[in-house]
Amino acid sequence: MKALNLDDKYYPVGAMIAAISDAKNKLLFASDFRKQARDFYQQKVADVYEYYERELRKNNALDFDDLLLVAVKLLQSNEAVLDKYSKRFRYVMIDEYQDTNHAQYLLAKLLASHWKNIAVVGDADQSIYAWRGADIQNILDFEKDYPNCTSIKLEQNYRSTKIILDAANAVIENNEGRPKKNLWTDKTEGAKIQHFTAQSEHEEAAFIGDTIAKKHDIHGVPYGGYGHFISYECSVSCT
């Protein structure tokens, strides 16, 4: 950022990294991104991207996103390379397919183009990585991309109770474009779900602490019998 005289207060390093990563996941080199930059901020992102790309080339290096971008571009532009590797990989298997981005989707499609033996596992109702480029449409369109495929629904749940699954079904049935399925279990009903909305982080922490203390004092539940899951955000800062 210093090399381009950009103030990281207005152009945070984390935001620049995310924007460049998103562009690469959409198969855009720096020059491609420059052409579609629509406003002043995007022009600055393009400046950073071009500088970063030059530095990578100076060091004969690729970053993680380049491993996908360059591979896809190579397979798309060189028929001999595509023919070699699509024949080499007779079977392509992918887990968590709902979390694939555009570059990963195309790479899989290219590698499976000869034998067309592709098996994917995924759940259209639990895509949570759109913020880093995941495209839910990849799994929703799988049967259109491979019309001769066989789909197997895994609807029995071995982990959760019936009450949990009933609540989950009630929520996910509102998702648009999803393939219909109904989660079920042969476990018992289970404890009722408790829901609490806090007005602040302090109120949330106090509620959790009070609840655990009451369970311990009234029912003798040991403190070590609890687990606390939180959503945590952190920013990337480079000096």
Question: Which residue ranges define each predicted feature?
Answer:
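Conserved P-loop NTPase-based nucleic-acid remodeling module centered on helicase motor cores
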Residues: M1-K24, L28-F40, D47
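P-loop NTPase Walker
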Residues: A3, D83, Q137, D166-N169, ...
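Conserved phosphate/pyrophosphate-binding and hydrolysis machinery centered on Walker-type P-loop NTPases
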Residues: L6-V13, K35-Q42, A61-D65, N101, ...
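Proline-centered turn/helix-capping motifs that create local helix->coil transitions or kinks
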Residues: D8, K24-A30, K116, V171-K181
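Conserved helicase NTPase motor core
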Residues: R38-D141, K153-S160
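Helicase P-loop NTPase motor core
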Residues: P147-T150, E155-T239
